[in-house]
Amino acid sequence: MPINKRPSDEFIALLRKSGDADINVAAAAQREFAKALELPLRKGVLVGNILGNIFETINVEAGSTTEFPLDLVSPGLEGEHVAYTNPGHGRIPERSVEGDYVMIPTYSITSSVDYLLRYAREARWDIVGRAMQVMEAGFTKKMNDDGWHTLLAAGVDRNILVYDADATGGLFSKRLVSLMQTVMRRNSGGNSASVGRGRLTDMYVSPEALEDVRNWGLDQVDEVTRREIYTAAGDGAPITRIFGVNLHDLDELGEGQQYQDFFTNDLGGAVQASDLELVVGLDQSTSDSFVMPVKEQLQVFEDPALHRQQRAGYYGFAELGFGVLDNRRVILGSF
């Protein structure tokens, strides 16, 4: 609900009824109000986040298991699946393969918000709209953190950290992008013509890394690229792609920031000795690794227990989970 735009007259009337002195009228209006909020909140939670469409949403029926099959070929064993020269006699060798699976646990996430009934009676849609934004932000923040914690854990489990040994510590360089591309290719399995082979498509960096890009001189980029950096909009990366890799900036990445602290303090990871910041690279060329099973879509309900306190409130919950089926799609770097 945008707080700088007046909603429809029907919405204003429903908001007034939700604060009616008749508790039965208020309860019915609050129930209808909750359902009216459910769809826009659900859209906001699924779209307005920094997961950037990384995870594929998979709706799962209630009561069913969230099992996902893994690739028949395990990482590091690609070379064992070969053909043989047939000498013309004897039996053809047998090679049995059996796929494994992983079960991703789902869990419930909840949030709530309440405000004075007086705001409803006076149709203060700006205050109510802000309250709904706070509720949406609670869900979004939870999903952002859980999704990125899963990605970082997959990167740490891979036990590969790429860094540019020739660059100054704390300075983002083009060579780091190139090195991460090469390491991703070398460690993705298969050969040059393998189908679905991993490659670096997206890189997530801190705002300070983009500041380094803005300060690249003529010894780093040509004059045309310098012009593009100079005229780039302030709400995005100064260069959106380097060597075909999409650049994304996250406030949560950077020295002393939330996700880097999670990487070092909770996961026990560490950047290169002379480096300061973490970089996350992903392969999003295929949707075969990052999954978000959803067992129960976001639902919003009114809270009738708050009427005695002369307040109106709403709460919501959803059941979902996050998983990385193949950690070869994640690579970490530092600068």
Language model region names:
Residues Y115-S194, S334:
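Alpha-helical scaffold segments that mediate packing/assembly in large oligomeric complexes
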Residues V177, Q181-H248:
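A contiguous, surface-oriented mixed alpha/beta subdomain in the mid-to-C-terminal portion of proteins
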Residues K35-I109:
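Assembly/oligomerization interface modules of large self-assembling protein complexes
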Residues V113-D114, S206:
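Short, aliphatic-rich beta-strand segments
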Residues M1-G44:
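N-terminal alpha-helical "arm" segments
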Residues P2-K5, I12, W216-F335:
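Sequence/fold signature of self-assembling virion shell proteins
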Residues S108-S112, L200, R311:
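Broad gene-expression machinery/nucleic-acid interaction feature
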